[in-house]
From Swiss-Prot:
One of its GO terms (molecular function) is protein homodimerization activity. Participates actively in the response to hyperosmotic and heat shock by preventing the aggregation of stress-denatured proteins, in association with DnaK and GrpE. It is the nucleotide exchange factor for DnaK and may function as a thermosensor. Unfolded proteins bind initially to DnaJ; upon interaction with the DnaJ-bound protein, DnaK hydrolyzes its bound ATP, resulting in the formation of a stable complex. GrpE releases ADP from DnaK; ATP binding to DnaK triggers the release of the substrate protein, thus completing the reaction cycle. One of its GO terms (cellular component) is cytoplasm. Transmembrane segments: none annotated. HAMAP family: GrpE (MF_01151). Its main location: cytoplasm. It is found in: Cytoplasm. CDD domains: GrpE. This is Protein GrpE. Pfam families: GrpE.
Amino acid sequence: MTEELKNKKINKKYYSQNRNKTKAEFQKADIKKNQYLNLKTKLNNVLLEVQNLKELNETLKKELKSEKQLNLAEISNLTKKYNQKELETKKYGASNLAKDLIQPLEILKKVVNAPNNNEVVQAYVKGFEMIINQINNVLESHHIKAMNVKVGDMFDPHLHDANEAVETDEYKTNQIVGVLSDGYMIHDKVLVYAIVKVAK
């Protein structure tokens, strides 16, 4: 039922009850009726506004909840990335220092392995071997290990760097025929590639 029909019914009812009243009473009654209708209209407007505000409030709550979830997800992702970077830094943090130490260590190994019969030199060689062992122990404590590449091993491009290809009948194709310097791993990652000669 529309608002206009409701108002007509109210008017009929109101006038039928008040036929015998005086003109002044009718005027008073009209004023009260108009006040009532105005208040009813205002009340309906207020109720409509309250309903609109409730709907807006629900919409804003949903948006806020969604935004909060997005922010929490972003914080979680950033935390995971930070933790991953921190783990990688701890795991591979010694890489640069180790790379700088490995080249002189390899030179020292070549000196120790060079043939020499001089007793004075042999005493130095024993001292150098002790130093090499200490450096290897320090490197291993940081999860850095020599690959221990040997002549006869198969060439692996993921671990070795071929410096020279040598024609030979003694070895199969892609078999290592000479090791110029050993390679090193840090955890599961190549730190320094072994430099080798390969049979072709």
